[in-house]
Amino acid sequence: MKSLNRQTVSRFKKLSVPAAIMMILSTIISGIGTFLHYKEELMPSACANGWIQYDKHCYLDTNIKMSTDNAVYQCRKLRARLPRPDTRHLRVLFSIFYKDYWVSLKKTNDKWLDINNDKDIDISKLTNFKQLNSTTDAEACYIYKSGKLVKTVCKSTQSVLCVKKFYK
């Protein structure tokens, strides 16, 4: 095998430096392009378009009025739920959207339920417990209206706000 002389080796060294630089630049540029192409998958935003972010939750005004059953179904389709009656965000939501909206509280045969999951709710922990406890109706659903929970007929149509946690 024939060995290369010093001049040939020197030429290879001179040519390999620009080639290496071009390869490095090409790798960096393609990496940036790949990142920009897959940006949504790599770094998802906290809330999707149309949802409003507040305190680790995303809120959506559906701009639809419907009954509680349909409201729960609509929020589930969006992988969300109706706002809970015990959340401190109710007043903030009212000030943002400025409308009455369903909350996930329902009274059925002296049982208080979260209509998102049909689990029992201890209403003694709610701020307007005395007002709620005085309800004598066999069935009642609730909306948040001007700073308080207000009883209404479950089949009536009210505004629907959906809520979900970040990255869900």
From Swiss-Prot:
It is a single-pass type II membrane protein. Residues 38-168 are virion surface. The chain crosses the membrane at residues 15-37. One of its GO terms (cellular component) is virion membrane. Pfam families: Lectin_C (PF00059). It is found in: Virion membrane; Host Golgi apparatus. Glycans are attached at N133. Its main location: virion. It comes from the Viruses. Disulfide bonds join C75-C162, C141-C154. Residues 1-14 are intravirion. InterPro entries: C-type_lectin-like, C-type_lectin-like/link_sf, CTDL_fold. The keyword Zinc-finger does not apply. Residues 54-163 form the C-type lectin domain. Keywords: Disulfide bond, Glycoprotein, Host Golgi apparatus, Membrane, Signal-anchor, Transmembrane, Transmembrane helix, Virion. Forms a complex with OPG162 and OPG190 to coordinate the incorporation of OPG164 into wrapped enveloped virion (EV) membranes and, subsequently, the production of actin tails. Therefore plays an essential role in efficient cell-to-cell spread of viral particles. Interacts with protein OPG161. Interacts with protein OPG164. Interacts with protein OPG190. Belongs to the orthopoxvirus OPG162 protein family. This is Protein OPG162. The lineage of its organism: Viruses, Varidnaviria, Bamfordvirae, Nucleocytoviricota, Pokkesviricetes.
